[in-house]
Amino acid sequence: MNILFEEFPKTVRVNGERFLVETDFREWIRFIQLIDDAKVPWQIKCRLLLQWYIDGIPDDLETAVYALGDFLAMKTENAEEDESITGSAPKQLYSFEQDAECIYSAFREVYGINLQTIPYMHWWEFQTLFAGLPEKTEIKQRIMYRSIDLRTIKDKDERKRIKKIQEIVALKKKNRRKMTDYE
């Protein structure tokens, strides 16, 4: 997909059929918060996630949930699947909850966009603008420091300095709910 001349998608495809989905960035941040909510059992989450479908819920619920995940990740229908398996999930480098102020101020500073008053912004547009924020913004600085592997820094003083910054900007650990045998 080329965003310079193609519109952002408003639908997902489930078993060959197109379904309209919510596209506003606020709804997708809520989607992420729901997924991350340790208090909500996975079966209930899946049912709640189906509310992101506007014009009816697909019959194949599992595929429907995966289609929403693909939309969240901005996967296009003809995108090649990444075949590499790393064995672990990538490290979380930002949180829409914990970094909200930094994200908000970066959008105001760089793009002149007030995320509270803008009536609508497509999730993919939001993500594209977020990725394009300059490195000098606070959120990009936090992401950069959180991503540094201290083992790669040879200089002891520099490693100590970076470690101190990482402790300051670290994401707070959430208590993850343990899954039951039925999940």
Give the positions of each predicted feature.
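Short conserved micro-motifs at the rims of enzyme active sites and ligand-binding pockets
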Residues: 33
